[in-house]
Amino acid sequence: MSTRREFLTTALAGGAAAALGPRRASAAPKSMSVVHESSFIKAFDDYFVKTLSPEYEKLTGIKVAYEPVSVGSMLTRLTTIVETKAGPEIVHTGINWPHLFDQGLLDVTDVAGEVGKKIGPWHDNILDSVVVNKKWKAVPWGNIGQLEVYRTDWFKEVGVTKFPDTWEDLLAAGRLLKKKGHPFGFELGHGFGDNHGWMYPLLWSYGGREVDKDGKTVLIDSDETAKAVDFCRRFYKETMLEDVLGWTDVNNNKAYLAEQISCTNNAMSILIVAKRDFPDIAKVTDHGLNPQGPKGRFHLYNPQSHAIAAHAPDPAAAKAFLRWLYDDKQLSRWLVAGDAYYAPFLNGYDNHPMWNVD
């Protein structure tokens, strides 16, 4: 079974005073709020609400409210916050959202720089997601890595003893498994993570791309894209449950744990929940790399970050909270509480003990 490590591959203008961290002050706000999409790992949310928020209130007198948003709804919530200039001042962003909401988010280059100096440096691969026009618009706390999740026992029943290395080999295995009553289930609906978590890598593995390296020249209409789409059509028709067309990110988790499917792409959440609630399923669950296509093997980054909304009434207080939250004393505990579901983009965590817990 894959180990967790395998599975995942500057101060405020106040200077020295800011470096001392959060402190009580007569002008400090009495409260602030953070909006987050609900995590697939409930303990991650619970740790913030039950441990981190009370600790910060005890330290500073500032109560930090935590607003959970249902899975798949964060982008809509963020759009409303930015357009109405109202709501929580600290917001959850995903993937490339800082680029979409550039004008609605404050510059947090100083915070990111300080965090990078203390527990970094930052991995270079995060910069394209959160740095907009040379300014950090969000501070990442981790990546939600994805692999292929599959039932080793059912694969063995059809003679497949290791996870297929190419898309065509996975298609062949899927045909056999579907005939045995163990179809695949890859999300093809209007989700937000699992659909593009496998479809972008599939597109890239055939040489397709949306735009050129300049980020402007549109290249999606190509022979390579057509080949990827044709494979996707066959993959769906010959291996999957029909209702994947209406799935969102929660459906494949539920289907796998209900033993309705033998393979899907997912983060660690399926295995984490299986180990807790379905130990017999966990024993026969493993992970494989995304298959190769004619142009190689690819995976998609899914960075999760905090940003400060432009309407924040006290940007200095919001930054002070993020500095405290991203201090190793807090951040490492939070990540561990979440079963290392999120892999930070900070070199200081590359060899953290949490990666050795299976």
Predicted segment positions?
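Hinge/lid segment of periplasmic solute-binding proteins
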Residues: 94-147, 171, 198, 282-288
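Short amphipathic alpha-helical coupling segments at ligand-binding clamshell hinges
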Residues: 48, 52, 227-231, 313-325
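Paired acidic/hydrophobic, glycine-rich loop segments that form the ligand-binding mouth/hinge
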Residues: 89-92, 262-267
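Extracytoplasmic/periplasmic solute-binding protein
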Residues: 133-141, 146, 171-218, 224, ...
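Conserved N-terminal structural module of periplasmic/extracytoplasmic solute-binding proteins
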Residues: 2, 6-103, 112-121, 134, ...
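Glycine-centered hinge/linker elements that transmit conformational signals in sensory
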Residues: 174-176, 180, 214-245, 290
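Short helix-initiation/N-cap motifs at beta->coil->alpha
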Residues: 68-77, 167-171, 244-257
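C-terminal lobe and pocket-closing loops
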Residues: 269-282, 294-358
